[in-house]
Amino acid sequence: MKIETKIAKFTKPLYLESGRILEPWQIIYETYGELNEKKDNVILITHALSGSHHAAGMYEGDRKPGWWDGLIGDGKAIDTTKYFVISTNVIGSCFGSTSPMSPIHPGSSERYRLKFPVVTIKDMVKAQKILLDSLGIRHLKAIVGGSMGGMQALRFAVDFPGFCENIIPIATTYQTKPYVIAINKSMIEAIRADSEFKNGNYDPDIIKQNGLKGLAAARMIGYLNYISPKTFERKFGREYVKTDGMFELFGRFQVESYLEYNGAMFPKWFDPLSYIYILKAISLFDISRGFVSLEDAFSQIKDKLHLISFSGDTLFFPEEMRDIKNYMDKVGGKCNYFEINSDYGHDSFLVELEKFDFIISDILKGEV
């Protein structure tokens, strides 16, 4: 599989939903496979909260492959012998696209930090569309994304009707609910409460080296909602860390050790400000904003919508995706709904690929 990483730089302003602008700005992306002569074999991959453009394959020195490697590649569900796959890093993220830690002016040593404008899912999608236009791509075979990536897929369908043959949102919602907004708020405040966050004026190199307890705590909060109680039970039970005494005040169960380790590792590769800004974008997501009603928003969709949810998702509940199906039926849209039986939790879209990869394969073959 041919893999390339590129950065597209733009000097024309990116006008944001808030009324503010980014100028100049850039977006980093990864491609897999070969673009055909007609440029009609393109699939766009959109990532979740802490994801990146590196969705598949491995580079020299990588510890593990891209986050959807089991789905993308030669002979896989998203077959790179047939399709040219583009995976972008969203505006606001910390892997190479314009973000809070980007220079506030070209050549400046001053970074945006908290002066960075609030970005929305709509802004992320607008940036992706500008990228595709710059590549001469006028139509997509499919857009596939899970969680926040599914929000981007839905937003694309509403904002650019007819641009894509198949829209495949996975484990997502049409409107972030108060429960998730509350979770996101808890994570944001955990970061802000850490004195080493310094109101966004931290040294990123020091954070990568020493970590940030507030971001680690935020990540632990997140894990409680990405993995189901049954999965925690299966993986850890009530086992205690062998080196810890059971009656030590800070002695740990295995599950506590797991949360501590993953929380501590997270700041070494993900930026605290990017985490805050992307959480805010997720909280703000509402597909009906700018429209008279939800029905009005969904009536804009002219493409085939294929919804994939998981029965045990406790972040974006399957009922929310069933609501999308109901709205699409009301407005006479083309929509399929698949509910996967799983008790793993929200992160099923990352770890249980074998339960839905064949659905994506069939969609791309035109068999659904």
UniProtKB/Swiss-Prot annotation:
Pathway: Amino-acid biosynthesis; L-methionine biosynthesis via de novo pathway; O-acetyl-L-homoserine from L-homoserine: step 1/1. Keywords: Acyltransferase, Amino-acid biosynthesis, Cytoplasm, Methionine biosynthesis, Transferase. Substrate binds at residues 219, 347. SUPFAM superfamilies: alpha/beta-Hydrolases. Its EC number is 2.3.1.31. Gene3D superfamilies: 1.10.1740.110, alpha/beta hydrolase. It is an enzyme of class 2 (transferase). GO terms for biological process: homoserine metabolic process; methionine biosynthetic process. It is found in: Cytoplasm. It comes from the Bacteria. One of its GO terms (cellular component) is cytoplasm. Residues 41-352 form the AB hydrolase-1 domain. The active site is at 147 (nucleophile), 313, 346. Transfers an acetyl group from acetyl-CoA to L-homoserine, forming acetyl-L-homoserine. NCBIfam families: homoserO_Ac_trn, PRK00175.1. Belongs to the AB hydrolase superfamily. MetX family. This is Homoserine O-acetyltransferase. It comes from Nautilia profundicola (strain ATCC BAA-1463 / DSM 18972 / AmH).
